[in-house]
Amino acid sequence: MTATPFEELGKALGFGSHLNPDMTREDVLLHLGKMPAIPANLGVAREEEFEYDGVRITTLSWKVGWGKPTQAFLLTPIDANGPLPGVLYLHSHDDLKEFGKEKVAQHQERQLPESAMWVRREHYGDRAPANELAKRGFAVLVHDCFPWGSRGFSLDELPPRIKEIHGTADSAEFENLSVMFESLSLNKYLSLYGATMAGILNFDDRVALEVAKSLPEISGPISVIGLSGGGCRALFLHATNPEIRAVVSTGAMATYASMLHEHITPHSWMFFPFDLASKGEWPQIGMISDTPLFVQYCGDDQLFTKEGMADAHAMLEKHDGGRGHYRGEFYPVRHSFTVEMQEAAFDWLAKHV
């Protein structure tokens, strides 16, 4: 089979031929690019409180120093008495930016429009996993990260050129337009600023960790969990924040080499911080810290190859060397976080309290 120009370019540039066997936290932070300083005063505000199906949900907001304020849900069991083990729940990408936290957390009936309910049905076993985790005795913080939900942008804020290329500026096409904006324009801004998509998301998530640590409902180190884009963000927190208790990453692990070439387009820029691949393979992001890491692989994942996932698992298992810091499991499902996977992840988190 004839090599494509992209494959030939990769070979000409030596892609994958100079991997550093010891990727460090400093390497990752360098390739995440510039990040704003976390404000000393985040202005955390408690707003409304709801009770839904055995869970108390408090709406919170805070300011990260730029852009729109972050809105979040704090979920605890209704009968909770005193501080609980904390979990930061990172919502998925889904090419759906109008909503973030609402994909995984429920505070009232009819919270998501029917047009967005496919995310719950196809990706989360038709339930709100953050609520299920809270019912198990955890305090769960779920926040919108840039550029989703409250941290997102309106149709009017999209560059005119995006609307021209797409051929419409209709609000019904907002999600398609936002995907084009992320792929075509946002990274240009970030490149000019010396930043990356992964770095800006990591910033928002580290701010959320600081908020979580300040909440009276949460005690001790905080765990992190996420599917897909949320799983990618969880891996970056695993690599950059040694204070975390444990991390579950679902549907976000394979080798960089296997993502080329038919699998690179479906992925967000968050997987590809500038030149990180020159320092190591993607699985090495999970080797920097000894923080317990549970990686769940979707065996029939349409976003990764079976070989790429198997190779990543082998690399992580070899690095762990039987120390018990890494656990990897394969499930015969497409890209999703099924009820079975959720129960396994929640059981594992409970063992690391």
Language-model features: locations:
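N-terminal targeting or regulatory segments adjacent to alpha/beta-hydrolase or S9 domains
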Residues: 1-58, 64, 100, 136
